[in-house]
UniProtKB/Swiss-Prot annotation:
EC number: 3.1.26.5
Domain of life: Bacteria
Protein keywords: Endonuclease, Hydrolase, Nuclease, RNA-binding, tRNA processing
Entries under SUPFAM superfamilies matching the protein: Ribosomal protein S5 domain 2-like (SSF54211)
Annotated function: RNaseP catalyzes the removal of the 5'-leader sequence from pre-tRNA to produce the mature 5'-terminus. It can also cleave other RNA substrates such as 4.5S RNA. The protein component plays an auxiliary but essential role in vivo by binding to the 5'-leader sequence and broadening the substrate specificity of the ribozyme.
Gene: rnpA
Name of the protein in question: Ribonuclease P protein component
InterPro entries: Ribosomal_Su5_D2-typ_SF, Ribsml_uS5_D2-typ_fold_subgr, RNase_P, RNase_P_CS
Sequence similarity: Belongs to the RnpA family.
Gene3D superfamilies given in the database record: 3.30.230.10
Molecular function via GO: 3'-tRNA processing endoribonuclease activity; ribonuclease P activity; tRNA binding
Catalysed reactions, semicolon-separated: Endonucleolytic cleavage of RNA, removing 5'-extranucleotides from tRNA precursor
Source organism (scientific name): Rickettsia africae (strain ESF-5)
GO cellular component labels: ribonuclease P complex
GO biological process terms on file: tRNA 5'-leader removal
Source organism phylogeny: Bacteria, Pseudomonadati, Pseudomonadota, Alphaproteobacteria, Rickettsiales
Length: 118
């Protein structure tokens, strides 16, 4: 399973427009399964965008740690065999409390939401 990141503002706007917005306690997930042509022609199956606001934490070190945790969570979730044939894109926006919650609980919450909406 191959994952790549959303590169520019245009890609983020496309996913925001085409995707379904899901509000959870620790994050907001925008997930799109009906992708435009630019994504379908790619060799990658999963497209990931992460938006960590300065409102969440002023320190860049903490914001970068949150991004690393999200990337690792997605790698774990997408490595499951049920995602092999599906192409989808998502944007994850963490909320307050995301950095304090333990990793296993985040894994459970995120995988539950993704599996329910693909």
């Amino acid at each position: 399973m191959s994952i790549t990141s959303l590169k520019n503002q245009k890609e983020f706007e496309l996913i925001n427009k085409l995707g379904k917005k899901l509000h959870e306690r620790y994050f907001i997930l925008v997930i799109a399964t009906k992708l435009p042509k630019i994504f379908l022609e790619s060799k990658y199956n999963t497209f990931l965008g992460i938006k960590v606001s300065r409102k969440l934490n002023k320190k860049a070190v903490v914001r970068n740690k949150i991004k690393r945790r999200i990337r690792h969570l997605i790698r774990i979730i997408v490595s499951d065999s049920s995602f092999k044939a599906i192409k989808f894109a998502m944007i994850i926006i963490p909320r307050k409390g995301f950095e304090e919650i333990n990793f296993s609980h985040l894994n459970y919450e995120l995988s539950k939401v993704i599996l329910r909406n693909i």
